[in-house]
Amino acid sequence: STILKNLIREMSPLGGVVVLEGKDINNYSSKNFAKQMSVVLTEKVKTELLTCRDVVAMGRYPYTNYFGKLTPEDERIVDESLESVAALDIAEKDFSQISDGQRQRIMLARAICQKPQIIVLDEPTSFLDIRHKIELLDILQNMAVKENVTVVLSLHEIELANRISDWVMCVRADGKILYGTPDEIFKDEIIRELYDIKNGSYNCLYGSTELEKKTGTPKVFVAGGGGFGVSVYRRLQHFEIPFSAGIIAQNDCEYTIAESLAVKVISEKPFEIFSGKSLEMAKKYVDIA
C-alpha cells in the first residue's frame, strides 16, 4: 500500500522521484494526472443520494468544464464503463445500498470511465467472495490485454497474483524486495523464505496451502493417485493421524501434496512400472499401519 500511495501522489518518496511518461508525477496538474492514472482504493466511499451511474460519472471529472456538465459523449462513456463491468442493471440503484461486490465493480467502472493509461488498485479483492474475485480479475485482465491499459494492484492472495500477473513485486517484512516474472518469483522455496513459513507449506504449482504434517509412526496407508487421495490426506492431517502413501508416480498431480502431508511417500519415476523394491516398501508400510 505504501508503494501504491507513492505512485498515486498520496505520499512523497523518501528519496528519488516517480516518473510517468518521462515526467515527474508531481509536475502534472490534477486533471492531467487523472487522465493518465485512475485509482481504486480499499476505503469505502461514503455517498448520499447518489446512484451508481452518478458515481461512475465522476470519472469524467478530468474532461468536464467548470460546472461539471456531461456531454453526450461523456454519457456514452459512462454507459460503456458500466457495461464493461456488467453493472448496467444496477446503474440507477442507490450506491449506498448495493453489496460489496457490486460496489467494487462500480468503483472500477468509475476508474475505467476516466480512460486512463494506468489503473492502480489497492487490494481490490478484499471482502469479495470467490465468484466476484474471479469476475473482477477477469475484467482487469481483459483491460490489460485488449485495451493496453497498465494495471498495478496489490494482492494478499498470491495464488491469484501468480495467475494474472506479468510482473510481480514482493516486499518482505524486513524490507527486502523481490521483483520478476511469476515463473521467477513463485517457487516453493522462495515463498517459504519470503513469508518465513516454518510450519506447513505453500504449493506454487496449485496455489494451495497445506498445514503442518503429523509425525510419528504411520497409522494408515493411503493408496492414492490421480488426485483421488488428496482429500484423504487432508482429512487424516485434520484428525492428526500420521500416515504413509504410495505408490505414486513423481509426476502425479497429487505427489507434491502427499510429500507435504505424509510421513512417508513411496514413489516411482514417471512412466516407470512399479519396481519390486517399491512394492515391498508399500507392503511394509501396509503392515505397519
Which residue ranges define each predicted feature?
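Conserved ABC ATPase "signature" region
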Residues: 57, 72-92
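Helical segment within the ABC ATPase nucleotide-binding domain
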Residues: 134-147
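ABC ATPase nucleotide-binding domains
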Residues: 195-276
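Catalytic Walker B motif of ABC-type/P-loop ATPase nucleotide-binding domains
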Residues: 119-123
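Conserved catalytic motifs of ABC-family nucleotide-binding domains
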Residues: 115
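Helix-to-loop junction immediately C-terminal to a conserved catalytic motif
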Residues: 8
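Conserved ABC transporter NBD signature motif
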Residues: 16-24, 33
